């Protein structure tokens, strides 16, 4: 463990957790042991002295884009998907608080009875008080992914880096599950991610990150303790940033 926060390169980060990551091996909903493991990983990073914010997806409950493909109005489908992210945020909050992690859920869609509305200054103040802020409701607008929400919130919170927890340990030039010869990138620039259509994040999210010089790190959430390792430049990951030497 690093006891001196000044020894860390990244002192404030945003973690993007997909809804699929919360359901483990299930086909729907939540796998609480998996959520507890993710929460333990987050606690390990907090104990390093790092300020942490989180954006959660909702794909384990509802995917708006899939519903739109079968005929549902896209905007309505996306709003339902946003509600799914609130369910996930509240679930994650409860598991984290069982581990004595102070949290606040802030939703882009106001739901005063269950969580706070998203107000940038309030969110920053929570983080200054060492609370983990869980952002729910996506951007609050349809036709936007939770990846875009993660990039926007990371920039608004002045985070040093956005870390996206996935099922693979980085960015590959092809799907490693389908192609055993797929090449993994250690680092790659924003332009190449877009040009090569690598689909680690949607194009809009990558473009906003590039414009604001927000580095993105892709890593696997499956291995216990990986979050803390990756934030210290250890372990397996891919970094997306402007300049690659």
Swiss-Prot record:
Keywords: ATP-binding, Cytoplasm, Kinase, Nucleotide-binding, Pyrimidine biosynthesis, Transferase. Its main location: cytoplasm. It catalyses: UMP + ATP = UDP + ADP. Inhibited by UTP. CDD domains: AAK_UMPK-PyrH-Ec. Its EC number is 2.7.4.22. ATP binds at residues 16-19, 59, 63, 166-167, 172, 175. Homohexamer. Belongs to the UMP kinase family. This is Uridylate kinase.
């Amino acid at each position: 463990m690093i006891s001196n926060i000044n020894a860390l390169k990244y002192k404030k980060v945003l973690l993007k957790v997909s809804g699929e990551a919360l359901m483990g091996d299930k086909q729907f909903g939540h796998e609480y042991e998996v959520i507890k493991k993710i929460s333990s990983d987050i606690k390990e990073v907090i104990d390093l002295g790092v300020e942490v914010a989180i954006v959660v997806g909702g794909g384990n409950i509802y995917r708006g884009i899939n519903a739109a493909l079968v005929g549902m109005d896209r905007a309505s489908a996306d709003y339902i998907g946003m509600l799914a992210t609130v369910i996930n945020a509240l679930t994650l909050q409860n598991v984290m608080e069982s581990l004595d992690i102070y949290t606040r859920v802030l939703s882009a869609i106001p739901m005063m009875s269950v969580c706070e509305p998203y107000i940038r200054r309030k969110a920053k103040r929570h983080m200054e008080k060492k609370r983990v802020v869980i952002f729910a409701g996506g951007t609050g607008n349809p036709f936007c992914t939770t990846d875009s929400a993660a990039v926007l919130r990371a920039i608004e919170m002045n985070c040093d880096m956005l870390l996206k927890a996935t099922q693979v340990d980085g960015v590959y030039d092809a799907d490693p599950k389908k192609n055993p010869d797929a090449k993994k990138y250690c680092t790659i620039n924003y332009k190449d991610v877009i040009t090569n259509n690598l689909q680690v994040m949607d194009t809009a999210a990558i473009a906003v990150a590039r414009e604001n010089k927000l580095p993105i790190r892709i890593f696997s959430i499956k291995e216990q303790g990986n979050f803390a390792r990756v934030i210290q430049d250890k372990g397996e990951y891919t970094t997306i940033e402007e300049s690659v030497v």
